[in-house]
Amino acid sequence: MSTSQTVHDVIIIGSGPAGYTAAIYAARAQLKPLVFEGTQFGGALMTTTEVENYPGFREGITGPELMDQMREQALRFRADLRMEDVDAVQLEGPVKTVVVGDETHQARAVILAMGAAARHLGVPGEEALTGMGVSTCATCDGFFFRDQDIVVVGGGDSAMEEATFLTRFARSVTLIHRRDEFRASKIMLERARANEKITFLTNTEITQIEGDPKVTGVRLRDTVTGEESKLDVTGVFVAIGHDPRSELVRGQVELDDEGYVKVQGRTTYTSLDGVFAAGDLVDHTYRQAITAAGSGCAASIDAERWLAEQD
């Protein structure tokens, strides 16, 4: 194990809109950020085929193209970007340590931007058809399913909200839930049930998503009788929750009951001095590229001001 003698002003963990925006702002502020992007840079947007709601791109842009442009912009300002995974951190005290392989790096401040991962069904066809009819974001992709028949999978508030939202575009929405009881709040469930475009299939699970090159249908199984059936649809929206990627910092910074990093008020300050968090790692609600980028900006500004106060 080798330890770098350089103490960086700031280390950023994670890429995606939050990490790259933090890197751009930190680099322009002459903080010379060291950024550990992970072995697959760009975050969740790397699997998003079309982004039409990010300001500045009138004709839209693909997720990978948007991330590549953000990455190139960070490089332009000489952020030190490294496609490596962080193995461990020690965030207490005036100098924080970040372990990557057999190297230990040090910094006065750390920005956490590891994001959150959408939960998946884990059925055949899901991974291959992601971006080709399978989605985890109705706000991002609903527009592309105008006048089509689609399904939403889930039983919580997010599933009800996404199903209701998708009725603005889709011809029909079938909400599939593996139980006959829902975790959703009463008001969200009633709102979905009152929508004439939404049909409920309870005690039902998807066993396979079909299509080549795009989704054409799903295979279903009744969880009570075992009876199998098929439903012709062109879209599958998976709304069974997200898992924040906070395991790296568990036991060091304060997390909420769902594992999201807690920040102070409207800032990006965490429970530890000199540690800031941004993007989907802290965001239960919006989970959009533009909001992640905004919080990445805020984290960098918070870190810059905090560092100035320490001098």
From Swiss-Prot:
UniProt keyword NADP present: yes
Residues the record lists as binding FAD: 15-18, 37-44, 53, 86, 280, 287-290
Binding positions for NADP(+) per the UniProt entry: S158, H177, R183, I240, Y260, R287
Keywords: Cytoplasm, Disulfide bond, FAD, Flavoprotein, NADP, Oxidoreductase, Redox-active center
MF-aspect GO terms: thioredoxin-disulfide reductase (NADPH) activity
Domain of life: Bacteria
GO cellular component: cytoplasm
Main localization of the protein described in the UniProt heading: cytoplasm
Quaternary structure and interacting proteins, as annotated: Homodimer.
Protein name: Thioredoxin reductase
Organism whose genome encodes this protein: Mycolicibacterium smegmatis (Mycobacterium smegmatis)
The gene coding this protein: trxB
